Amino acid sequence: MIEQRPVSNLIGHLILILGIIIVAFPIYYTFVASSMTSTQIIRPPISLLPGDHLVENYREAIFGGVERVVGVSLERLLWNSFVVAMAIAVGKIIISFMSAFAIVFFRFPMRMFFFWMIFITLMLPVEVRILPTYKVIVDLGMIDTYAGLTLPLMASATATFLFRQFFLTIPGELVEAARIDNAGPFRFMRDILLPLSKTNIAALFVILFIYGWTQYLWPLLVTNDAKMNTIIIGLRRMVDWADASTPWNYVMVTAILAIIPLILVVVLMQRWFVKGLVETEK
């Protein structure tokens, strides 16, 4: 039994509070800046209390302000990011789940060779893969399409490895029982593996959704049409619009609105996310 010491508890809580402040302060600072005019933002020091233009800034940014700056509405930027993040998260989970299922539960020649070929891709930096991938997308005519934005990012060696490690912990008795019941591979996957994997899938979904939402380099390469930009690319274009007249109030509003979906995903799936991480490490 671990002895509870008041001093240790106090130090632990102080460290946690400090960590929360370090993480939360930039978000709060951005929110405060989103309630001020662009002139107030570029004249430090900025007040730590919200300004008088909160509603006005958000209303103007949503109803045409951002579109005047980058040529595409804020709603379209958010929608593009949502489509990309959902497609990448769901696509990675489906492909990785099926790949791990085949590697663990099917016996075919060179299956471990194929697994290690998938795993070795983790050692390749993005810069090595991005140019040949871009060439393929150009040749297939997928520039400025959702397919071009998402398909190259759907394969995931990490998710395949995690699913494989989890499937290896499935008792052999379950597999034998499924065979005795005359259950085929897909029925076994649907009725046994999917229910057992739901917490792992939830944890991976949160991680992969954030990964897809925050993509910058790939969308920057494969989108020329402003209407296909994601919210991250939109932010970059707003900052680069004109150094002397950058609408920093719109930039801060857009940054806050870009964070909200990620916070909602984490909060709504927090219980499943934590449970999935704990069960994965067992």
From Swiss-Prot:
The lineage of its organism: Bacteria, Pseudomonadati, Pseudomonadota, Alphaproteobacteria, Hyphomicrobiales. Keywords: Cell inner membrane, Cell membrane, Membrane, Transmembrane, Transmembrane helix, Transport. Part of the ABC transporter complex UgpBAEC involved in sn-glycerol-3-phosphate (G3P) import. Probably responsible for the translocation of the substrate across the membrane. It is a multi-pass membrane protein. It comes from the Bacteria. The complex is composed of two ATP-binding proteins (UgpC), two transmembrane proteins (UgpA and UgpE) and a solute-binding protein (UgpB). This is sn-glycerol-3-phosphate transport system permease protein UgpE. One of its GO terms (cellular component) is plasma membrane. Residues 78-269 form the ABC transmembrane type-1 domain. Gene3D superfamilies: MetI-like. One of its GO terms (biological process) is transmembrane transport. PANTHER family: ABC TRANSPORTER PERMEASE PROTEIN MG189-RELATED-RELATED (PTHR43744), SN-GLYCEROL-3-PHOSPHATE TRANSPORT SYSTEM PERMEASE PROTEIN UGPE (PTHR43744:SF8). The chain crosses the membrane at residues 14-34, 86-106, 112-132, 146-168, 201-221, 248-268. The keyword Membrane applies. Belongs to the binding-protein-dependent transport system permease family. InterPro entries: MetI-like, MetI-like_sf. SUPFAM superfamilies: MetI-like (SSF161098). It is found in: Cell inner membrane.
